[in-house]
Structure formats: structure tokens, C-alpha cells
């Protein structure tokens, strides 16, 4: 018997989740839910339905786990509690400062529906956090550093695009080279997460 999975949101994350499901024989993609016209969404999995988000409640007893693939800025704070009342849910909410608030909202909704809500299990927080935990367990007297970039931040870019009047936007994260070198040289500097920001039109 396979675990029936629903995907809500079919952008880069949703497509990646579909590929992961296809690699696990005990999982089956039941449906993808989208805000777009379902006729325009082409998925890889034969036999899986593509439905409008508005139709999700009709799948309440047909899906074991709903994986929410929206953005942390505005999608997941609303979607995860809403759908935790109907399904077991998983999200990758990554606004670190708001995780306790998000947990409280999802926990209450999941309990109301008799479901399980698992939040913030993307990369960071998520798999990357576990890697850091393992390293700290093995080297308890060590000092760990986290550098992001060089690269595009999907979450920050999503937040930028949701600002009224912004047609498109990308946020690039570039670590401070002097900080990288200090760590590489074994200087164990005290660093903060504050960085400089610039905008280019």
C-alpha cells in the first residue's frame, strides 16, 4: 500500500517534490493543486490529477499527506494552518524569526483536524540544520559557521516579487569575503547575520 501524496503549488519546489516522490516506491502522487489553469500545468506523473486549489477539500479522504510548496512570505502562513485542518501537512516555512508563531498556528489547526503538521523541513531550516546538528554532536567543542551564497535566494526573491508594483525581482546572497577568509584561516571570528543590502534597478 502506497502513501498518497498531494502537492499544493507547482513551481520549482513542487516540481522537485514530484521528482522525489517518483524515486520512492512506497509513495504515489495523487494530485497537484495549482492557482493556475490546470489545463496549462504539465506534470511528469501519469495518472495523477491536476486540480484547482479551490477543489482541494474534495480530496480530504483521498490524500494521506499534503506537501505545501508555496512561499514563506505570504503563502505558508495562511495555507499550512488552513490545510492542516484537512490533511497531514508538510511545509518548508523558513522565516526563522516567525517559526514559533507559525508552529503555534499549525499545531492548533492540526489538533483541531486530528492531523499531523510538520513545518520548516526544507533546507534551512531542515536538512541543513540536521547536518549542523550532526557536526556539533561529533565535534562538541568546535565552532560552526553558516555562509549563504553566492546565489539567488528563492524565498527572498519570492518576497520581493510580492511587493506591490514590482514586476519581477531576484535577491542575490553574497558572503563577505573577509569573513570567509577569517574562518578558513582558523581565526574563529565572532560574526553576526547582519549584511549590507543594495538594490539595482
Report residues per predicted region.
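Extreme N-terminal starter segment of soluble prokaryotic enzymes
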Residues: 1-5
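Active-site-lining helix/loop region of Rossmann-like oxidoreductase modules
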Residues: 8, 16, 136-201
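Hydrophobic/small residue at the entry helix of a nucleotide-binding pocket
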Residues: 13
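NAD(P)-binding Rossmann-fold cofactor-contacting core
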Residues: 23-45
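Rossmann-fold NAD(P) dinucleotide-binding segment
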Residues: 56-61, 65, 73-92
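General beta-strand structural signal in soluble alpha/beta enzymes
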Residues: 91-92, 117-121, 147, 170-171
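Rossmann-fold NAD(P)-binding glycine/threonine-rich loop
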Residues: 93-117
Amino acid at each position: 500500500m502506497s502513501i498518497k501524496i498531494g502537492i499544493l503549488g507547482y513551481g520549482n519546489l513542487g516540481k522537485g517534490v514530484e521528482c522525489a516522490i517518483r524515486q520512492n516506491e512506497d509513495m504515489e502522487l495523487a494530485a497537484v493543486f495549482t492557482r493556475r489553469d490546470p489545463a496549462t500545468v504539465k506534470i511528469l506523473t501519469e495518472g495523477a490529477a491536476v486540480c484547482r486549489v479551490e477543489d482541494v477539500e474534495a480530496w480530504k479522504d483521498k490524500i494521506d499527506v499534503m506537501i505545501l510548496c508555496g512561499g514563506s512570505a505570504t503563502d505558508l502562513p495562511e495555507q499550512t494552518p488552513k490545510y492542516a485542518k484537512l490533511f497531514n501537512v508538510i511545509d518548508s516555512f523558513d522565516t526563522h524569526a516567525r517559526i514559533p508563531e507559525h508552529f503555534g498556528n499549525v499545531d492548533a489547526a492540526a489538533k483541531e483536524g486530528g492531523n499531523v503538521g510538520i513545518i520548516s523541513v526544507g533546507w534551512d531550516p531542515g536538512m541543513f540544520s540536521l547536518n549542523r546538528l550532526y557536526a556539533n554532536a561529533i565535534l562538541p567543542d568546535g565552532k560552526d559557521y553558516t555562509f549563504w551564497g553566492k546565489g539567488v535566494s528563492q524565498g527572498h526573491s519570492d518576497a520581493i516579487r510580492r511587493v506591490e508594483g514590482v514586476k519581477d525581482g531576484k535577491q542575490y546572497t553574497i558572503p563577505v569575503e573577509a569573513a570567509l577568509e577569517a574562518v578558513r584561516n582558523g581565526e574563529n571570528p565572532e560574526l553576526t547575520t547582519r549584511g549590507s543590502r543594495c538594490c539595482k534597478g
